[in-house]
């Protein structure tokens, strides 16, 4: 038995304005070079643009977008007998949300547009409607997992 205590599970803090953990997770992923105030500005501007575009609660659009992009299953490279197989594995909710946020930010960075707030708001609205690059990435991951279903027993 190990002598070390078990690490306490970290809970994500909520942001100051919306009091939402998802917004804080988004801020921490968009953060570059420790400029957290700039990250907050970008997120809040994006949420304001979503409010103007859709005339609905931006948090519900954000939740819907993340729910739509969150994958249930992913593939993991596993080396078996000299060859590497892509083994499908199930993903937990926390890891799925983290992946979804990463994909949303990656897709919004690749978008053409004026600034990051505009690109992020457009990507979130598209993802909430069921379109955009992040949704395509999720579907591609699910297709990969389905194609490699034969290797599921290598888990």
From Swiss-Prot:
A GO term, aspect molecular function: rRNA binding
UniProtKB keywords: Chloroplast, Plastid, Ribonucleoprotein, Ribosomal protein, RNA-binding, rRNA-binding
Keyword Ribonucleoprotein: yes
Protein location: Plastid, Chloroplast
GO biological process, alphabetically ordered: translation
Gene Ontology cellular component terms for the protein in this record: chloroplast; small ribosomal subunit
Pfam families the record matches: Ribosomal_S7 (PF00177)
Keyword field contains Oxidoreductase: no
Main location: plastid
Cited InterPro entries: Ribosomal_uS7 (IPR000235), Ribosomal_uS7_bac/org-type (IPR005717), Ribosomal_uS7_CS (IPR020606), Ribosomal_uS7_dom (IPR023798), Ribosomal_uS7_dom_sf (IPR036823)
PROSITE patterns linked: RIBOSOMAL_S7
Gene3D superfamilies xrefs: Ribosomal protein S7 domain (1.10.455.10)
UniProt subunit comment: Part of the 30S ribosomal subunit.
Family recorded in the similarity comment: Belongs to the universal ribosomal protein uS7 family.
Matching PANTHER family: RIBOSOMAL PROTEIN S7
NCBIfam families: rpsG_bact (TIGR01029)
Biological function: One of the primary rRNA binding proteins, it binds directly to 16S rRNA where it nucleates assembly of the head domain of the 30S subunit.
Protein name per UniProt: Small ribosomal subunit protein uS7c
Lineage, uppermost ranks: Eukaryota, Viridiplantae, Streptophyta, Embryophyta, Tracheophyta
Gene name in the database record: rps7
